[in-house]
């Protein structure tokens, strides 16, 4: 897909930042307008992250205009907002391939461009990495500058504050830009504050500030008086800030959509010494009314018609696994006031919107704080409640120590509803749920369940909720299979079920690839087993299958290394059972973006791939 660049004459002159910096400053507002329209036209045709990019158009233009990228390091946190950055850094013609197999990466990616200095995808990493780059730049001694852009959501994470605390302590030269899009631009974030920001970042104020500190450094009472006077003066017109206490020079808030003022403020700040924080106010979805009105709904979008202002409705009546979880949550909470649901800022994605509205006293969104979420749940369990942590597989990685130290060691009854297990599709390497079975399986006391359809998912959530110890139910992104939902009942822990009796080959399936495995079992007259539990493994059943079949095939949408199949291998070795075993799953490399079905086919995890691998093994 290629757009007619002739419709965007100013943008056509800015193929890369070098060309951008040659434009007169007066042309920047026009460039921003065209960039925003280009982004709208592109994403509406290709799908992708949308509202975040619209909100940082002016900031992106100003940063590349003022800073000498890629010599200067520009670090984007998370990266949802980096589409304008990609368009301005030589990837304009490829932006229509973003998030597609073999296309542009959905986030900044080091292997894709020299302008992407940090590969990202998870939140709150930018300041830590940026500080490391700033220290390296200081030792290099060539005047390289470091800028980190972080949102008001991502900055709530502990890692961001840990990094700021360290930056303030070692006083390295770096700029952190806080992109605050929680509210629309208010009147006090207008001319006065823009003028104040330029004044506070200007050379005269800075030299007086630093010179005065040096001159009176030996006289504590006078130094303290100056500091109090400075804070009082700033406090009249800008928010009081935690950032100054962390050692940052705070400037702002300023209008993040005034590209001229933003450019001047950044020019003033470029030469400042020590850690600086610029607080800008932006509107997520800026320039496209439907996205401004509903920035969450327009955060990541399918292909749509810009003229209609609406997103296409999903087809079919089969619910997603996230919806199945949310409905089960409400059903259970209606009967049990001890239920407490915890999520680290993933209410919409985890299917918890209805629950949060109907049971607000039992719902906790702890923000982007996965470590806190898990230990908070441990505390709830100690207090006699029944906590459920709803979390994506990829984000549970961030709370691994808490899972072990605060939940499993104490054998606390915390249920983990792990969404996005396995291949997730367009978000690529940083978001694949490829490792959870591997990193949980080695933890004592854990019960790990892998449903094969939405009915089993409900039954396993019910079972895990009533289990007296830590339990995890791991389910994929996307729709169920259309299975009939049965009344809830507790399942026997650690027991699989034989779905089909066959000969010679037994296929042991962990999770929702069962439907694909069923086709293969029918074609090969193989035994098919829905294993259900990764831990505790149904050892009795596995040993029976090993004794009655020539080949065992394990199938899972998880890394082969350390996964469910490895558990089968370990059991057979421990019992000295000599039987041929083929482990099928995800390979030992990070899986890039692509549609889920595309990637399953590539890794031989669709029906045709499973069958061909088994047939090759039997030769």
UniProtKB/Swiss-Prot annotation:
Biological process terms from the Gene Ontology for this record are:
1-deoxy-D-xylulose 5-phosphate biosynthetic process; isopentenyl diphosphate biosynthetic process, methylerythritol 4-phosphate pathway; terpenoid biosynthetic process; thiamine biosynthetic process
Query: Among the entry's GO cellular component annotations, what is one?
Result: cytosol
GO MF, one annotated term: thiamine pyrophosphate binding
Matches recorded under Pfam families: DXP_synthase_N (PF13292), Transket_pyr (PF02779), Transketolase_C (PF02780)
Which UniProt keywords are present, listed alphabetically? Answer: Isoprene biosynthesis, Magnesium, Metal-binding, Thiamine biosynthesis, Thiamine pyrophosphate, Transferase
Q: Which reaction does it catalyse?
A: D-glyceraldehyde 3-phosphate + pyruvate + H(+) = 1-deoxy-D-xylulose 5-phosphate + CO2
Cofactor(s) demanded: Mg(2+); thiamine diphosphate
Listed EC numbers: 2.2.1.7
Lineage, top-rank taxon, reads Bacteria
The record ties this protein, via HAMAP family, to: DXP_synth
Cited function? Catalyzes the acyloin condensation reaction between C atoms 2 and 3 of pyruvate and glyceraldehyde 3-phosphate to yield 1-deoxy-D-xylulose-5-phosphate (DXP).
* UniProt name for this protein: 1-deoxy-D-xylulose-5-phosphate synthase
Q: Which organism is it from?
A: Yersinia enterocolitica serotype O:8 / biotype 1B (strain NCTC 13174 / 8081)
Chain's gene name: dxs
């Amino acid at each position: 897909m290629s757009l007619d660049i002739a419709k965007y004459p100013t943008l056509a002159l800015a193929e890369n930042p070098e060309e951008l910096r040659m434009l007169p400053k007066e042309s920047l507002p026009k460039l921003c307008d065209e960039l925003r329209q280009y982004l709208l036209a592109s994403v509406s045709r290709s799908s992708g992250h949308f509202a975040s990019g619209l909100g940082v158009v002016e900031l992106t233009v100003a940063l590349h205009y003022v800073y000498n990228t890629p010599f200067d390091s520009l670090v984007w946190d998370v990266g949802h907002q980096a589409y304008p950055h990609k368009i301005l850094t030589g990837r304009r013609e490829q932006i229509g391939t973003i998030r597609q197999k073999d296309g542009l990466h959905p986030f900044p990616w080091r292997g894709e461009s020299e302008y992407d200095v940090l590969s990202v995808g998870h939140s709150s990493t930018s300041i830590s990495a940026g500080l490391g780059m700033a220290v390296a730049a200081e030792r290099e001694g060539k005047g390289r500058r470091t800028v980190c852009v972080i949102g008001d959501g991502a900055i709530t994470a502990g890692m961001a504050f840990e990094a700021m605390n360290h930056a303030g302590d070692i006083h390295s030269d770096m700029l952190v830009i806080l992109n605050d899009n929680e509210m629309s631009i208010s009147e006090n974030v207008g001319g006065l504050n823009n003028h104040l920001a330029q004044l506070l970042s200007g050379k005269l104020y800075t030299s007086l500030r630093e010179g005065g500190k040096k001159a009176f450094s030996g006289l504590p009472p006078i130094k303290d008086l100056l500091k109090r006077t400075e804070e009082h003066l700033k406090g009249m017109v800008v928010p009081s800030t935690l950032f100054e206490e962390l050692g940052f020079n705070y400037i702002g808030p300023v209008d993040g959509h005034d590209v001229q003022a933003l450019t001047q403020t950044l020019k003033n700040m470029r030469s400042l010494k020590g850690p600086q924080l610029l607080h800008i106010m932006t509107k997520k979805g800026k320039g496209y009314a439907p996205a401004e009105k509903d920035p969450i709904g327009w955060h990541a979008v399918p292909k749509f018609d810009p003229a209609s202002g609406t997103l296409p409705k999903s087809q079919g009546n089969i619910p997603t696994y996230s919806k199945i979880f949310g409905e089960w949550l409400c059903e259970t909470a209606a009967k049990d006031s001890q239920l407490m649901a915890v999520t680290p800022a993933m209410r919409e994605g985890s299917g918890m919107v209805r629950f949060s509205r109907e049971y607000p006293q039992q719902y906790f969104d702890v923000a982007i704080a996965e470590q806190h979420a898990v230990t908070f749940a441990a505390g709830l369990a100690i207090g006699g409640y029944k906590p459920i942590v709803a979390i994506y597989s990829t984000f549970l990685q961030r709370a691994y120590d808490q899972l072990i130290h605060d939940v499993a060691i104490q054998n606390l009854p915390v249920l983990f509803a792990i969404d996005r297990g396995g291949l997730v599709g367009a978000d690529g390497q940083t978001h694949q749920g490829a490792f959870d079975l591997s990193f949980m399986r080695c933890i004592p006391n854990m019960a790990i369940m892998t449903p094969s359809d939405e009915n089993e998912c409900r039954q396993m959530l019910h079972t895990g909720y009533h289990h007296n110890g830590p339990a995890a139910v791991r389910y994929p992104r996307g729709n169920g299979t259309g299975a009939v939902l049965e009344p809830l009942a507790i399942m026997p822990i650690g027991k699989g079920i034989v779905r089909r009796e066959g000969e010679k080959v037994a296929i042991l399936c962990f999770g929702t690839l069962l439907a694909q495995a069923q086709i293969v079992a029918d074609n090969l007259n193989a035994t098919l087993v829905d294993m259900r539990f990764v831990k505790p493994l149904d050892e009795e059943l596995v040993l029976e299958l090993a004794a009655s079949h020539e080949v065992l095939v394990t199938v899972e949408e998880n890394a082969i290394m350390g996964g469910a199949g490895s558990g089968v291998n370990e059991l057979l070795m421990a019992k000295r059972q000599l039987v041929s075993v083929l482990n099928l799953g995800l390979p030992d490399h990070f899986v890039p973006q692509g549609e889920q079905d595309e990637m399953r086919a590539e890794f031989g995890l669709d029906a045709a791939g499973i069958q061909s691998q088994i047939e090759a093994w039997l030769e």
